[in-house]
Curated annotation (Swiss-Prot):
This is C-type lectin domain family 1 member A. The keyword rRNA processing does not apply. Residues 1-52 are cytoplasmic. Residues 31-42 have a biased composition (Basic and acidic residues). It comes from Homo sapiens. Keywords: Disulfide bond, Glycoprotein, Lectin, Membrane, Signal-anchor, Transmembrane, Transmembrane helix. The lineage of its organism: Eukaryota, Metazoa, Chordata, Craniata, Vertebrata.
Length: 280
């Protein structure tokens, strides 16, 4: 009986083992092998500073772009303002230049008017006194019209008088207006027995008369009297007692030199009070 129980237990054990084995095999066949599970861990803490850094850089770039845009806008405004300012300054400069030119023209006109008045007053003083310190001529020279004259008492040939006048920075007497003729005649009357050379001559007998500066003579002002008493050629002209004669150029006559008068200085018109008292 015990042998039977033992046999049965053995069979059960065998069956149990078989069952366990089959169960295990069935479980092994039905259970799929589990794949290796990949762990999805949270982002590493090292990426967070990088992301923050990139974000910060982006913000800095945006701020920089905004600042550049603002600077460009300000520069554009300043550029336009500068252009407007330059245009305004150029306009003002043009207006100032025109005003300056206008003032210069007015100044020239005023200076001309002042000079005219000063010359007129000085001439009145000169004619009354016979000489005045306001005269535009140097001492011993006579003022008439626009010129200064000097009547020398030394007698020279026509050519010597020519070079003498040149040495005095002047030329020989030239009569091209009626006023000049009257002035020269009045001076010749004062020296009744003396004649004065003029700057009129002709290169050869029969040719045209020319003044010293090459200007041709016109007979409308005066007539040249041929002096038949001169033994040689009569190609130079002298004035005697208001009359015009042709003379031999080698004869000795007094010299008359003339040169352009200077400008009358308005300050020279001032008359000291003591001078006015003496006149009274």
């Amino acid at each position: 009986m015990q042998a039977k129980y033992s046999s049965t237990r053995d069979m059960l054990d065998d069956d149990g083992d078989t069952t366990m084995s089959l169960h295990s095999q069935g479980s092994a066949t039905t259970r799929h092998p589990e794949p290796r599970r990949t762990e999805h861990r949270a982002p590493s803490s090292t990426w967070r500073p990088v992301a923050l850094t990139l974000l910060t850089l982006c913000l800095v770039l945006l701020i920089g772009l905004a600042a550049l845009g603002l600077l460009f806008f300000q520069y554009y405004q300043l550029s336009n303002t500068g252009q407007d300012t330059i245009s305004q300054m150029e306009e003002r400069l043009g207006n100032t230049s025109q005003e300056l030119q206008s003032l210069q023209v007015q100044n020239i006109k005023l200076a001309g008017s002042l000079q005219h008045v000063a010359e007129k007053l000085c001439r009145e003083l000169y004619n009354k006194a016979g000489a005045h310190r306001c005269s535009p001529c140097t001492e011993q020279w006579k003022w008439h019209g626009d010129n200064c004259y000097q009547f020398y008492k030394d007698s020279k040939s026509w050519e010597d008088c020519k070079y003498f006048c040149l040495s005095e920075n002047s030329t020989m007497l030239k009569i091209n207006k009626q006023e000049d003729l009257e002035f020269a005649a009045s001076q010749s009357y004062s020296e009744f027995f003396y004649s004065y050379w003029t700057g009129l001559l002709r290169p050869d007998s029969g040719k045209a008369w020319l003044w010293m500066d090459g200007t041709p003579f016109t007979s409308e002002l005066f007539h040249i009297i041929i002096d038949v008493t001169s033994p040689r050629s009569r190609d130079c002209v002298a004035i005697l007692n208001g009359m015009i004669f042709s003379k031999d150029c080698k004869e000795l006559k007094r010299c008359v030199c003339e040169r352009r008068a200077g400008m009358v200085k308005p300050e020279s018109l001032h008359v000291p009070p003591e001078t006015l008292g003496e006149g009274d």
